[in-house]
Amino acid sequence: MNQSLLSEFGDPIARVEAALAALRAGRGVLVADDEDRENEGDLIFAAESMTNEQMAMMIRECSGIVCLCLTDERVRQLELPMMVEANSSHYQTAFTVTIEAAQGVTTGVSAADRITTIRAAIADGARPSDLHRPGHVFPLRARTGGVLTRRGHTEATVDLMQLAGLKPFGVLCELTKEDGSMARLPDLVAFGRQHQMPVLTIEDLVQYRQLLSERSA
């Protein structure tokens, strides 16, 4: 990962701290994964505070596949089956069936409808009957152990929410360029500058979690 591009956002620990502060304030963050992995960047918001306007930005600036990152516990609570029984995707991305709020939505595809669906899924007393399947929101099941177990955007999202003291649910979508191609690190940095969003990497988050583990040992 080209650290010189990220230097304006501080060192790895400072970048994570800035991201946590932004999430607590209801703002978005940009997370890049390893260059030898997907080499992509995701726009991420806290599920509990995401607004219609932020969802509209995500739909406009990203790939359109809006994903709700959930813990395994929440997936079980909602009784969401996995999208496929035998996952053959290269990085084992753990999609469940897609969802829609059972009440309060129209077609389910608008920014407001997707926010309604997300709020239904993350409510404290959420039940399987609160959701219809299929829908326009794509839940992802995070692996237990977070980025120390799997260095994916799903795990990074849940880790960030937990470290920020928020509900362990986040919304992500892959940032794209105007021509529809995937945004890389230079594009993330430019987008972060334009929208005052912190930029960090999954490697930063791994280092941060390892440091916390060492301090508590």
UniProtKB/Swiss-Prot annotation:
Entry binding sites for D-ribulose 5-phosphate: 37-38, 42, 150-154, 174
GO CC terms in record: cytosol
InterPro entries in the cross-refs: DHBP_synth_RibB-like_a/b_dom, DHBP_synthase_RibB
One Pfam short name: DHBP_synthase
Pathway: Cofactor biosynthesis; riboflavin biosynthesis; 2-hydroxy-3-oxobutyl phosphate from D-ribulose 5-phosphate: step 1/1
Cofactor: Mg(2+); Mn(2+)
Site (Essential for catalytic activity): 136, 174
GO molecular function, one term: magnesium ion binding
Chain sites annotated for binding Mg(2+) 1: 38
Residues engaged in binding Mg(2+) 2: 38, 153
Keywords, sorted A to Z: Lyase, Magnesium, Manganese, Metal-binding, Riboflavin biosynthesis
Highest taxon of the lineage: Bacteria
SUPFAM superfamilies the UniProt entry points to: YrdC/RibB (SSF55821)
Cystine connections: none
GO terms for biological process, alphabetical: riboflavin biosynthetic process
Subunit-level organization: Homodimer.
Entry-linked PANTHER family: 3,4-DIHYDROXY-2-BUTANONE 4-PHOSPHATE SYNTHASE, GTP CYCLOHYDROLASE II-RELATED
Functional note: Catalyzes the conversion of D-ribulose 5-phosphate to formate and 3,4-dihydroxy-2-butanone 4-phosphate.
Name of this protein: 3,4-dihydroxy-2-butanone 4-phosphate synthase
Species the sequence originates in: Aeromonas hydrophila subsp. hydrophila (strain ATCC 7966 / DSM 30187 / BCRC 13018 / CCUG 14551 / JCM 1027 / KCTC 2358 / NCIMB 9240 / NCTC 8049)
